[in-house]
């Protein structure tokens, strides 16, 4: 039997890459051949090859920067990327092309449509990104994590890796847990400067109550470590990136983080109370992602413009492990744990028509 082939397009941020990687690994288990479209010097260039997945690099940039120079150069990058992906498609002849959103998906989505290859989209957020909005008009099938985001789309959830789904539930995690409150700090896959600046001060003021596991991102690891060391805060674990995120979720009583779609989905699946500081996009995409958890009392949302040391200290002082356990159980009630199966069923169904 000839194996089916798929090209997955995802890059720029962990929020696009990691869901795509989860899908890729599951498809490989099912006998599919997978190629990837991404960009160099990016999170996908560091991670995807380590899983034995062939990655093709294109030169493309996002359109959030609307400077005159960017507006002039962007069409050139898009056109070059379009022809590069079109060549890959014609050479490899995939059965399906899957776009995970973000600027990497744009040229390849149009190229797959032009080559009459079924184009599938997956939207992780509660507000669709500009690329998925455009491509949804020409795609074969749209998938979304939440209802009402893309037109004519099937709700499938956000795919997360099995290690996260297997994290013990809040009842088992919190049982017999004592000692300092364990707070996980994650500013997205590339870190957050504002969290790296504020959290060492918070740690100093609450060193008798809190221990942090802080992911700083690659660029600010040493600078953030110096802040903690200067305050003689040796009990905290400071790392640039947490590869085994499931172990970090299992360890934590609470998470302070951005509210990217994948992070919110993972927190719901694991069951973990959260303090969200949404990235301040104009469309408030991350704020929308976090609203359901705040509504049921599983999380608190702080706009970045209001964020300061005193506010975080006051919130943490108001919490104890019993309250965090209640927040964790509420978060757990919203977890969607069958997303990968839903997505595979859609992909498999479309592939049988090719």
From Swiss-Prot:
GO molecular function ontology, one term from the record = undecaprenyldiphospho-muramoylpentapeptide beta-N-acetylglucosaminyltransferase activity
List the InterPro entries hit by this protein, alphabetically: GlcNAc_MurG (IPR006009), Glyco_trans_28_C (IPR007235), GlycoTrans_28_N (IPR004276)
Its localization reads: Cell inner membrane
- The residues listed in the UniProt record as binding UDP-N-acetyl-alpha-D-glucosamine, with positions renumbered to this chain, are 13-15, 125, 189, 242, 261-266, 286
An example Gene Ontology CC term for this record: plasma membrane
User: Could you mention a single GO BP entry for this protein?
Assistant: cell wall organization
Enzyme Commission code:
2.4.1.227
EC class of this enzyme? Answer: transferase
Q: Mind listing the UniProt keywords for this protein, alphabetically?
A: Cell cycle, Cell division, Cell inner membrane, Cell membrane, Cell shape, Cell wall biogenesis/degradation, Glycosyltransferase, Membrane, Peptidoglycan synthesis, Transferase
User: How is it placed in the membrane, per its record?
Assistant: Peripheral membrane protein
- Major localization class: membrane
Q: Which Pfam families match?
A: Glyco_tran_28_C, Glyco_transf_28
Q: In which pathway does it act?
A: Cell wall biogenesis; peptidoglycan biosynthesis
The keyword Transmembrane helix is annotated on this UniProt entry: no
Which reactions appear under catalytic activity for this entry? Answer: di-trans,octa-cis-undecaprenyl diphospho-N-acetyl-alpha-D-muramoyl-L-alanyl-D-glutamyl-meso-2,6-diaminopimeloyl-D-alanyl-D-alanine + UDP-N-acetyl-alpha-D-glucosamine = di-trans,octa-cis-undecaprenyl diphospho-[N-acetyl-alpha-D-glucosaminyl-(1->4)]-N-acetyl-alpha-D-muramoyl-L-alanyl-D-glutamyl-meso-2,6-diaminopimeloyl-D-alanyl-D-alanine + UDP + H(+)
Q: Main role?
A: Cell wall formation. Catalyzes the transfer of a GlcNAc subunit on undecaprenyl-pyrophosphoryl-MurNAc-pentapeptide (lipid intermediate I) to form undecaprenyl-pyrophosphoryl-MurNAc-(pentapeptide)GlcNAc (lipid intermediate II).
NCBIfam families according to UniProt: murG
Question: PANTHER family this protein is in?
Answer: GLYCOSYLTRANSFERASE, UDP-N-ACETYLGLUCOSAMINE--N-ACETYLMURAMYL-(PENTAPEPTIDE) PYROPHOSPHORYL-UNDECAPRENOL N-ACETYLGLUCOSAMINE TRANSFERASE 1
Can you tell me which family this protein belongs to?
Belongs to the glycosyltransferase 28 family. MurG subfamily.
> Can you say what this protein is called?
UDP-N-acetylglucosamine--N-acetylmuramyl-(pentapeptide) pyrophosphoryl-undecaprenol N-acetylglucosamine transferase
Native species of this protein?
Buchnera aphidicola subsp. Acyrthosiphon pisum (strain 5A)
* Name of the encoding gene: murG
């Amino acid at each position: 039997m000839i194996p089916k082939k798929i090209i997955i397009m995802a890059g720029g941020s962990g929020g696009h890459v990691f869901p795509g990687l989860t899908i890729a690994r599951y498809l490989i288990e099912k006998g599919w051949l997978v190629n990837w479209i991404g960009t160099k010097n990016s999170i996908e260039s560091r991670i995807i090859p380590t899983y034995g997945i062939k990655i093709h690099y294109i030169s493309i940039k996002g359109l959030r920067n609307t400077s005159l120079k960017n507006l002039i150069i962007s069409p050139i990058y898009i056109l070059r990327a379009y022809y590069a992906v079109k060549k890959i498609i014609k050479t490899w002849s995939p059965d399906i092309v899957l776009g995970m959103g973000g600027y990497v998906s744009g040229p390849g989505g149009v190229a797959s449509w032009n080559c009459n290859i079924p184009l599938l989209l997956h939207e992780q957020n509660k507000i669709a990104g500009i690329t998925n909005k455009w491509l949804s008009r020409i795609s074969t099938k749209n998938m979304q994590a939440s209802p009402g985001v893309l037109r004519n789309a099937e709700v499938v959830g956000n795919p997360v890796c099995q290690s996260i789904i297997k994290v013990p539930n809040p009842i088992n995690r919190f049982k017999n847990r004592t000692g300092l409150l364990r707070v996980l700090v994650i500013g997205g896959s590339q870190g957050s400067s504002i969290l790296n600046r504020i959290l060492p001060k918070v740690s100093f003021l609450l060193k008798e109550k809190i221990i942090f596991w802080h992911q700083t991102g690659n660029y600010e690891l040493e600078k953030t470590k110096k802040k903690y060391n200067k305050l003689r805060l040796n009990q905290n674990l400071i790392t640039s990136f947490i590869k085994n995120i499931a172990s970090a979720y299992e360890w934590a009583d609470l998470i302070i983080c951005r509210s990217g779609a994948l992070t919110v989905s993972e927190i719901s699946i694991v069951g973990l109370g959260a303090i969200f500081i949404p990235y301040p996009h104009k469309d408030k995409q991350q704020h929308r992602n976090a609203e359901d958890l705040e509504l049921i009392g599983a999380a608190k949302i702080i706009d970045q413009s209001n964020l300061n040391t005193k506010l975080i200290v006051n919130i943490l002082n108001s919490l104890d492990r019993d309250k965090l356990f209640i927040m964790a159980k509420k978060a757990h009630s919203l977890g969607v744990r069958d997303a990968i199966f839903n997505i595979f069923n859609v992909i498999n169904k479309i592939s049988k028509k090719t």
